[in-house]
From Swiss-Prot:
The modification Sulfotyrosine is found at residues 114, 131. Pfam families: Sulfakinin. Residues 1-33 form the signal peptide. Belongs to the gastrin/cholecystokinin family. Residues 34-73, 86-108 form a propeptide. One of its GO terms (cellular component) is extracellular region. This is Drosulfakinins. The modification Phenylalanine amide is found at residues 82, 119, 136. The gene is Dsk. Drosulfakinin-0 (DSK 0) plays diverse biological roles including regulating gut muscle contraction in adults but not in larvae. It comes from Drosophila teissieri.
Amino acid sequence: MGLRSCTHFATLVMPLWALAFCFLVLVPVPAQTTSLQISKGDRRLQDLESNMGAESDQPNANLVGTSLSRFGDKRNQKIITFGRRVPRPIIPIELDLLMDNDDENTKAKRFDDYGHMRFGKRGGDDQFDDYGHMRFGR
């Protein structure tokens, strides 16, 4: 009876030990992941600085270093999303509805019934004849 209880106990404990081992090995510690990300960012920053130094002959290397460190920090703060970015219109839809876009009114002001463009509407409608031609001296 003692041997049977030991095997029963071993069959219960072995999967738990295997699960704990997998958890410890496969799941990274948050401190390790942040240090890895920082080291990757530093490596990218050094590569960018070396590339910028080779391409440009600027005496102000400190200014280049500070701008690149800001760029590196922003790259590390990038948020990972699950899909592509949806393009947004420049004018929001709500604002577009509130704006007065009467194309018919502007066409009526610019063109007569025959499609001729009317220029210089300071004098009113009597300045033009029925065909859209300007009247002079009448």
